Swiss-Prot record:
Tissue expression profile of the protein: Expressed in pharyngeal muscles and mc cells.
Record protein name field: Zinc metalloproteinase nas-14
Cystine crosslinks: 158-311, 182-202, 380-414, 387-407, 396-411, 469-503, 476-496, 485-500
Main function: Metalloprotease.
Sequence ranges of Basic and acidic residues compositional bias: 342-351
Cofactor remark from the record: Binds 1 zinc ion per subunit.
Amino acid sequence: MRLLYSLFHCSAFLVGFTLSVGVLPIPNEHAASIKAKFDDYAEHYLLPEDFHNAETAPVKKPTDAEIESMQNSLLFEGDIMGVPEIEKSDILKRLRDDPLLDEDEIFRKPFHSALNLVTYPDKLWPEGQVPYMLEEGMTNDQRTAIAQAFDEYKTKTCVRFVPKTDDDFDYIYVKRNVAFGCSSYVGRAGGNQTVSLEVDKCFSKGIIAHELMHALGFFHEHSRTDRDDFVDINEDNIRPGMMRNFEKYPRKIIDSLGMPYDYESVMHYHKLAFSRNGKPTIIPKDNEADVGQRYKLSEMDSKKVNKLYQCGEYSKTSSTTTTTTTTTTTTTTEEPTTTTEVEEKPKDKKVSSTTTTTKKPTTTTTTTPKPVERSRNKKCEDLNAHCGMWEQLGHCQHSVKYMAHYCRKACNLCEVEVTTTTTTTPKPVPRNKEKENKSASSTTRGTSTATSTTPKTTTTTTSAPKEKCEDKNLFCSYWAKIGECNSESKFMKIFCKASCGKC
């Protein structure tokens, strides 16, 4: 993909064309193939408009009944892929009755994964970067929901979902299904691993965030070794054959990361999970607890992700820089009365005077440095993991509003470095006053005077260019004439607004 980036600049589209018998320039094979490739990348990765829509679109809160309808009884715990169906009952029986001797028996390579990094040290995504690719044909609403889930992790954790490149062997492939529920592997499974989302059921921020948290390496909260201290499992209400979805894991497989049990986790089963009669299957011991939300990452979810991936407050390197401010303490003392004779010698006469100094306060200022945290967000940086790719695809010019805010560095729209110049010009001192000061300083104790000036700071900011509604490609008129405006072409929507009447 990197080799293709340079081809997407507008200048590339002008290379090689033929003129029709009439007026419109007709693109040659090279120009047509570049348009097709642009559309291909736009299909498989999110665009600025998807994240813009994610900010304004309402976030759906699925009900317990809706969540229950997404469960797939053929999958391990309803949504976990990678566990062979034939061996589930036997494996889980031995999990209850006997310590697990060979962890690969439950998660066969290359699909095994779990939280315990002593057991599974290679199942995290390196540096918290998760390459992804989308199935083509996603609707705008589906892309918006995925963008909302990606933003949820971007806002609360250090994990980033980034466009897959040719160098990425391991990546998640987000695809749609019909009547198969929502599902994912747990952790980095190796190669192309699927996050599958049922159409009309699974495309909401919280549901997708749940499946992505599986992909990051997390099981359901009720599977924790210590879960019996926090919830009761009512077997009488569980559908026949579904008890296997309520098992606990031994510590060899699952690691709680030293975090408390979280009723509010997006990974917790809801009360009616796999219910046979509409009555609760999971009952919190805390009567006020509500479990099973699929709306957002809880505070504890975010901490778990950050701790597992050693970032945020759990980073080995501090994420903030430190500066200092000052604390001032003032103490006032009184000086004794002092009489001083001052002699002035003008050219023609001699004047003798006596100056009486009354009691006056002397101020002593003590300055103590105080550390203050400064956020990294003040730096000029891109706020979306897609910015590099978008810049190469020309979105700095064609998605101006979003890019100017979230991709300032990639689009070279950062503030010019601020330079502050302070010049202090002392006021002229009258000759007589200067002599008086010199004389006084030789006969009395010195006092210190602190003077502070407030410099003027000039900041020059490069503003984002205004977006014009015009065609950005020579061949837009031709493509519009042959009906491309009515297609799903992202290229036409971005580069051919005038010809397509989208101004």
